[in-house]
């Protein structure tokens, strides 16, 4: 799934045809056929030593990029109610993808209830955020449902 090319790690995304996002069984079967990739990164270990267990699976259909995160954590919170809001204040995952070598990339941050912050950028600052129309086109299926909730303690997936 990953390879090194010119000092960069390149991930090849598997193509699975015939999967329609509305067919949840087919989507889950496709995800189940893909080996989970661990996310073994804690960006600020001095400030936040706890890191949840996180892995992801990804494929594309030619028309859709399909991404699933599996997260197990001790505390879960989902208070942000709008897209392009402060999703980083909730339990969330982050995904970066650079479709070419231009130096620009997309940054997706998604809460455990499916609220998204999407940016297109070349550097950390100065992001161009997705429009409401683009946000509406991104299909989501959060396992914890779409409704906000206060912090919960206990294992949640």
Model feature map: region roles:
Residues 4-157:
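Structural preference for beta-rich elements and adjacent junctions enriched in aromatics
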């Amino acid at each position: 799934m990953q390879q090194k090319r010119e000092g960069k790690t390149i991930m090849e995304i598997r193509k699975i045809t015939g999967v329609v996002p509305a067919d949840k069984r087919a989507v889950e079967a496709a995800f189940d056929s893909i080996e989970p990739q661990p996310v073994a990164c804690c960006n600020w270990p001095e400030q936040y030593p706890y890191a949840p267990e996180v892995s992801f699976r990804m494929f594309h259909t030619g028309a859709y990029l399909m991404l699933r995160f599996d997260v197990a954590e001790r505390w879960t919170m989902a208070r942000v109610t709008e897209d392009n809001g402060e999703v980083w204040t909730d339990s969330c995952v982050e995904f970066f993808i650079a479709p070419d070598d231009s130096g620009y990339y997309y940054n997706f941050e998604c809460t455990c209830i499916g609220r998204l912050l999407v940016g297109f950028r070349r550097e950390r600052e100065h992001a161009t955020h997705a429009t409401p129309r683009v946000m509406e086109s991104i299909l989501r299926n959060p396992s914890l449902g779409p409704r906000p909730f206060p912090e919960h303690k206990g294992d949640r997936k």
